[in-house]
From Swiss-Prot:
Cofactor: [4Fe-4S] cluster
Official protein name in the record: tRNA-2-methylthio-N(6)-dimethylallyladenosine synthase
Organism of origin: Paramagnetospirillum magneticum (strain ATCC 700264 / AMB-1)
Enzyme Commission no: 2.8.4.3
Binding site for [4Fe-4S] cluster 1: C12, C48, C86
Subunit annotation: Monomer.
Class of this enzyme: transferase
NCBIfam families per the UniProt record, alphabetical: miaB-methiolase, MiaB/RimO family radical SAM methylthiotransferase
Cellular localisation: Cytoplasm
GO MF annotation terms: 4 iron, 4 sulfur cluster binding; metal ion binding; N6-isopentenyladenosine methylthiotransferase activity
Similarity comment text for this entry: Belongs to the methylthiotransferase family. MiaB subfamily.
């Protein structure tokens, strides 16, 4: 009898990729997808540890799942509960202490061993904890990816050696590791053969990817652009310190590389950037932005900002607001600083009051909303090539994404799903654009 798997994903795009690969790993055991946890024989929570609230959400969800697990047992069945990802890596033993009904706890580098963990949990009847950083890369043991839809994530780099003072990633994802170019290109070819037209390369420091013998991310993207069927390429998340001339030239020369770049800066204050151990200052970032926009005049930028970092003064915060205006970010992910246990910033004495964080976050988000809407309105009348990837909400409507990641609605025939078509933007909605055939 077929078994059903439900995976709930928290956090970043890397977790989305990992969740899909966990499903691939478990498919040979007979697990097919479930739409809801209530239908599942196995539930995996793939977790994020970036902020405190994200971790607490996991424990809250486990409380709900415990009831489903008990109901399944009363009906004579079994629901395997697994916690994966960065919370599992950082707090594996705490998870088993607070939620002893969990069957499997595994880190982000060990999910290729899930079949063995499932078998071990069934044999022993107790919890399995696997949060090692194995010497062998997990990618060497994963099956071919299962392509669904017209867009896909492709992990090329994991881990981080930057050790920003606020961040847990070096501790939960481990040291930086780059997948071999041949493996990346083979996976891209498999995805394209399955109908994928847009590939987003993923990494904690994706532009730090290196393949030896002169291979950097720019060269990898050039090779990826030669893969038959790949029409659009993106990459995230990049670090300003790893943005080299070869990659910038790729933005200038490759039409497949979308003119939208997520380049996190976190703060516009030199003092705070130094306290964060970001390894660059404000002017270095601005010079990099100028260089990128000179190479690719149509380029639009997004970023991450942390407000209320320990010691952030009103002047520091205003420097961030000024940087947002100067760069003209069309999108940002902005967050209140959240102390993460074990990081240097958590031990800093000058913590900012929550009320101040709330006010600053509201100001940043209001400014960014204004800039986003200005950018969207500036798109009206422009012709763009849109990848149509699904039916829209209304009959006869399709939904796609612009080169700048904006959702775009158009009246079009269903057979155009999976194609890149020229459209003219005609109208701005609060969360999307409207278009007609160009």
């Amino acid at each position: 009898m077929a078994k059903r798997l439900f995976v709930k994903t928290y956090g970043c795009q890397m977790n989305v990729y990992d969740s899909a690969r966990m499903a691939d790993v478990l498919a040979p055991l007979g697990y097919g997808p479930a739409d809801h946890a209530e239908e599942a024989d196995m539930v995996i929570l793939n977790t994020c540890h970036i902020r405190e609230k994200a971790a607490e959400k996991v424990f809250s969800e486990l409380g709900r799942l415990r009831k489903l697990q008990a109901a399944k047992a009363e009906a004579g069945g079994r629901m395997i509960l697994a916690v994966a990802g960065c919370v599992a890596q950082a707090e594996g033993e705490e998870i088993l202490r607070r939620a002893p009904f969990v069957d499997i706890v595994l880190g982000p580098q060990t999910y290729h061993r899930l079949p063995e963990m499932v078998a071990q949990a069934a044999r022993a009847g107790g919890a399995v904890l696997d949060t090692e950083f194995p010497a062998e890369p997990k990618f060497d043991f994963l099956p071919e990816p299962h392509a669904e839809g017209t867009s896909a994530f492709l992990s090329v780099q994991e881990g981080c050696d930057k050790f920003c003072t606020f961040c847990v990633v070096p501790y939960t994802r481990g040291a930086e590791y780059s997948r071999p170019a041949a493996a990346v290109l083979a996976e891209a070819a498999t995805l394209a053969a399955g109908g994928v037209r847009e590939i987003t390369l993923l990494g904690q420091n994706v532009n730090g990817w290196h393949g030896g013998e002169g291979w950097g991310l720019g060269r990898l993207i050039r090779a990826l652009a030669e893969v038959e069927g790949v029409e659009r390429i993106r990459y995230t998340t990049s670090h300003p310190r790893d943005m080299d001339d070869e990659l910038i030239r790729a933005h200038a020369e490759l039409p497949q590389l979308m003119p939208f770049l997520h380049l996190p800066v976190q703060s516009g204050s030199d003092r705070i950037l130094a306290a964060m151990n970001r390894g660059h200052d404000r002017d270095t970032y601005l010079r990099l932005v100028d260089k990128l926009k000179s190479a690719c005049p149509d380029l639009a930028l997004s970023s991450d900002f942390i407000v209320g970092f320990p010691g952030e003064s009103d002047a520091d915060f205003e420097a961030s607001m000024d940087l947002i205006r100067r760069v003209g970010f069309v999108q940002t992910y902005s967050f209140k600083y959240s102390p993460r246990p074990g990081t240097p910033a958590a031990a800093m004495e000058t913590q900012v009051p929550e009320a101040v964080k709330d006010e600053r976050l509201a100001q940043v988000q209001a400014l960014l909303l204004d800039q986003t809407m200005r950018f969207n309105h500036a798109c009206v009348g422009r012709e763009m090539r849109i990848l149509l990837d699904r039916p829209g909400r209304h009959a006869g409507q399709l939904l796609g994404r612009s080169p700048y990641m904006q959702p775009v609605h158009v009246k079009a025939a269903a057979h155009l799903i999976g194609t890149v078509v020229p459209l003219r933007i005609t109208k701005v909605h609060p969360n999307s654009l409207e278009a007609v055939p160009a």
